């Protein structure tokens, strides 16, 4: 689930900031900007600061009156969103797909797993590890959802449908990192200590989705991300099958199925917002796309590579696990899913936002084609996750 948004493809898309819309509250607070350390100014990197700059952060941008919309949707969410959760007793668990340590055949099962993994290329493991690390940063994602005004879990055990969804979604997602982590541990193909360090760094750094405590922006972001993870895990499943590890293909495939179900829930929320507030919602979609959807693990660091996420995402792009084309395809899918082209009765700003969003995917594709044509072969980069081996970018 990776893509480099510092690439020429995305830098070339010029964006202009629109004037303050009805979506934004006049009461907006700016958090400080974290600057990366530099030799020139003598700064020393702080141990718990993100590996790269975090944008100037806007907070609480949703006008207070918009909160009433989410309060009014409690009954709808009960009947239409919580149905996309599975009862715990019907959910798969990581142990269903792993060698059973209580069985007499445990050692033989581990040997079989390691044998299957022997011929899988290192670059595939780089991408699989990156996906697993992204899943393991789950505490950050629950934290992010609980920053959203009007839908956060106010008590830690709130019984509003929004809070129930966030906790249960987190519980379902928790199985993904558990399963991939244990499979990779048993494979013997990766440096688990370096991976564990990367996870700790990532959770400590957090994420910067630029959702502004605004549930409009937050649910648009999660709609995009769940589809991105569905695509990414689906492609790692396909690659595992091609490399002959059918069990690993099953593992990645079952995770992809969860992501698809979660995508359905989040896209339904945004669909409902389009129904009750089309102008505010299309402005929010345009806002998120102007800012560009950053991947959840964009602050990834392993203690060695300051450009780890960029390198990981480049390998994912080369292998076709998650690409710039996928980014454009997701946008196009959501535009169709939410029927943005058919929106009527919009304000002047709403019309501009609709036209911008509907025309963006073709522009991204054209820019990516040009970037690929100009792309130069990059030197291989060592990845600590695979014991410092050089991996082609």
From Swiss-Prot:
Transit peptide endpoints, chain numbering: 1-30
Organism of derivation: Solanum commersonii (Commerson's wild potato)
Subunit description: Homodimer.
MF GO annotations: metal ion binding; stearoyl-[ACP] desaturase activity
Presence of the UniProt keyword S-adenosyl-L-methionine in the record: no
Taxonomy of the source species: Eukaryota, Viridiplantae, Streptophyta, Embryophyta, Tracheophyta
Residues involved in Fe cation 2 binding: 173, 226, 259, 262
Cofactor remark from the record: Binds 2 Fe(2+) ions per subunit.
Coiled-coil regions listed in the entry: none
UniProt-recorded name of the protein: Stearoyl-[acyl-carrier-protein] 9-desaturase, chloroplastic
Family according to the record: Belongs to the fatty acid desaturase type 2 family.
Protein location: Plastid, Chloroplast; Plastid
Annotated function: Converts stearoyl-ACP to oleoyl-ACP by introduction of a cis double bond between carbons 9 and 10 of the acyl chain.
Pathway noted in the entry: Lipid metabolism; fatty acid metabolism
Pfam families the UniProt entry points to: FA_desaturase_2
Annotated positions binding Fe cation 1: 135, 173, 176, 259
